[in-house]
Curated annotation (Swiss-Prot):
GO terms for molecular function: small ribosomal subunit rRNA binding; structural constituent of ribosome. One of its GO terms (biological process) is translation. This is Small ribosomal subunit protein bS6. It comes from Pelodictyon phaeoclathratiforme (strain DSM 5477 / BU-1). It comes from the Bacteria. One of its GO terms (cellular component) is ribosome. Binds together with bS18 to 16S ribosomal RNA. The keyword Endoplasmic reticulum does not apply. The keyword Iron does not apply. Keywords: Ribonucleoprotein, Ribosomal protein, RNA-binding, rRNA-binding.
Length: 134
């Protein structure tokens, strides 16, 4: 029996579609993962963004990330279904190793969101140190 591993699937769905069609494409991917024996741990829908370059003559994409656990044999079956879905512009499935998870924890620990109270405190501290140095 294969052991389940943690994966992340990043999707770019055609941003020109109606919200119902985007929801249907997301539901399709999630359904395929669960039907093939995987279990979804988190879904992060980022929303519509401008792409860096045209993909299939589209410049707006709907970005989403799905974290799931599945056996390695499931990935090929999921990719087979995703590959032929016309509404999906791009997809990438990666195996989340312990090194990647550790790096993600460090980034979350030390990152500061611009405009947050922590960011304001850092900016004030930097300004105070600049005036003291002069």
């Amino acid at each position: 029996m294969e052991t389940n591993k943690l994966y992340e699937c990043t999707l770019i769905i055609d941003g020109g579609l109606q919200d119902e069609a985007i929801a249907a494409a997301m539901a399709l991917v999630q359904r395929v993962i669960t039907e093939k024996g995987g279990s979804i741990s988190s879904v992060l829908e980022i929303g519509r963004r401008k792409t860096a370059y045209p993909i299939k003559k589209k410049t707006i994409g709907y970005y989403a990330h799905i974290e799931f656990t599945a056996a390695t044999s499931v990935i090929a079956e999921v990719e087979k279904v995703i590959r032929y879905e016309e509404d999906l512009l791009r997809y990438l499935i990666i195996h989340l190793t312990s090194a990647l998870l550790e790096m993600r924890k460090r980034v979350e620990k030390y990152s500061v969101v611009i405009g947050s109270p922590e960011d304001s405190a850092l900016a004030e501290a930097a300004a105070a140190s600049d005036t003291v140095a002069k």
